Regions:
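Outer-membrane pore/translocation modules
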Residues: 5-144, 166-167
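Predominantly the C-terminal beta-signal and adjacent terminal strand-loop region
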Residues: 142-168
Length: 168
């Protein structure tokens, strides 16, 4: 969060940065296969109903890159809109869509691989120690999509350490 003051529509300005590393754990030498960098700046809005938090919505400008140049580059920018809604104590849904900003000839087919929207559903047990999630990314073709399945388990109630596994 960049400011504590409220902006119009009770929004706030924030920055984000994520980095994803893709590993091939079955390979003995050089198991790291790919890196992905994703900085962004956005406006956020908490969704409150009857004095209770039920979700959040974001409007962002994001950059995504594998850090390479020339023909190996997968760099692109996008304007994204996303929301997350808490359905009850155990279930949450998320949705994210984007408008790509593609610069000329570079990566003009990026939507073929990175899609046009994502939808996720997460389940968390009442004691908040086990969480299961599924994320579907719709690619350009109507019946083409990527799926991620995630499982995390919190070892100790008092610690913030998890066992996490993801299938992509």
């Amino acid at each position: 969060r960049l400011t504590k003051s409220k902006l119009p529509f009770d929004s706030y300005l924030f920055i984000q940065y994520t980095k994803k590393a893709v590993w091939n754990v079955f390979r003995e030498s050089l198991p790291m296969r790919d890196l992905n960098f994703n900085p962004g700046i956005g406006l956020g809005h908490l969704i409150i109903r009857h004095n209770k938090y039920i979700g959040k919505a974001y409007l962002m400008l994001e950059h995504e890159s594998n850090g390479k140049d020339s023909i190996d580059s997968r760099s692109w920018n996008k304007i994204t809109f996303s929301w997350a809604l808490v359905l009850n104590d155990n279930w949450e849904t998320q949705f994210k869509t984007w408008i790509p900003i593609i610069d000329g000839e570079n990566n003009k087919d990026i939507l073929k691989y990175n899609g046009i929207f994502q939808f996720a559903v997460n389940y968390r047990t009442c004691n908040k120690r086990l969480q299961i999630g599924a994320l579907i990314t719709q690619r350009k073709a109507w019946f083409g999509f990527n799926t991620q399945l995630e499982l995390s388990y919190k070892f100790n109630k008092r610690e913030n350490q998890f066992f996490f596994i993801q299938y992509y």
